[in-house]
Amino acid sequence: MYVLNDKCFYFVRQLNDDPIRQHHADPYGFLTCYDLESKTWETPVLVEDSQSRSDFIVFDSNLYLFHAPIDREHIGILKIDTSDLAGSEVLLQANMGSSCFYPFVQYDENHSLCMSYTVDRKHIRLARVDMAKLV
């Protein structure tokens, strides 16, 4: 969950029980927003996602979601259209080369964007993300 101006953005993983693919359920994330002034929910958007952990960050006045779009070896960045969630777009999907759990994104004391994550739930890594090169 992330509050930006008068909106509360909410993202959680859900499972889509697809009757066509009876052998397994397709994972996806449920992205929506609650307007704190009008007290209304926006129409939710489904985002391909494979784990229940994600994190929001604001960069250059834009809202982004870091999550696992394909499997736990991938990290994805979704640029969120704060005025129309359906207009949100995938900015990046990268293979991390090993399992990547619990991404947490924050700015350091030099205002550089950093992401910590665990590898195989055993080791914690810290990476610097140069968002200016990605957007």
Question: Where in the sequence are the language-model features?
Answer:
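Beta-rich carbohydrate-recognition and catalytic domains
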Residues: 1-52, 58-98, 108-112, 118-135
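C-terminal regions of proteins
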Residues: 99-103
